Amino acid sequence: MPIAQIHILEGRSDEQKETLIREVSEAISRSLDAPLTSVRVIITEMAKGHFGIGGELASKVRR
């Protein structure tokens, strides 16, 4: 069972996350010739104050 773990900054809509899960699952299924029903996707959302970009908090870099 392939498992993809994706870390993203908070703020995406449920629709965007659903699209991400669907498209990642389809890509994994295709590339590994695995049944789509066996693919798992875990999304971990991070607060912008808990992630750094270029030495700065993401909350300061991305508004």
UniProtKB/Swiss-Prot annotation:
Catalytic residues (UniProt): P2
What superkingdom does the record give? Bacteria
Q: Which GO terms fall under molecular function for this chain's record?
A: isomerase activity
One BP term from GO:
xylene catabolic process
Enumerate the UniProt keywords alphabetically. Answer: Aromatic hydrocarbons catabolism, Isomerase, Plasmid
Q: What Gene3D superfamilies does the annotation carry?
A: Macrophage Migration Inhibitory Factor (3.30.429.10)
Q: Which PANTHER family match?
A: 2-HYDROXYMUCONATE TAUTOMERASE (PTHR35530:SF1), TAUTOMERASE-RELATED (PTHR35530)
What role does it play?
Answer: Catalyzes the ketonization of 2-hydroxymuconate stereoselectively to yield 2-oxo-3-hexenedioate.
Protein name as annotated: 2-hydroxymuconate tautomerase
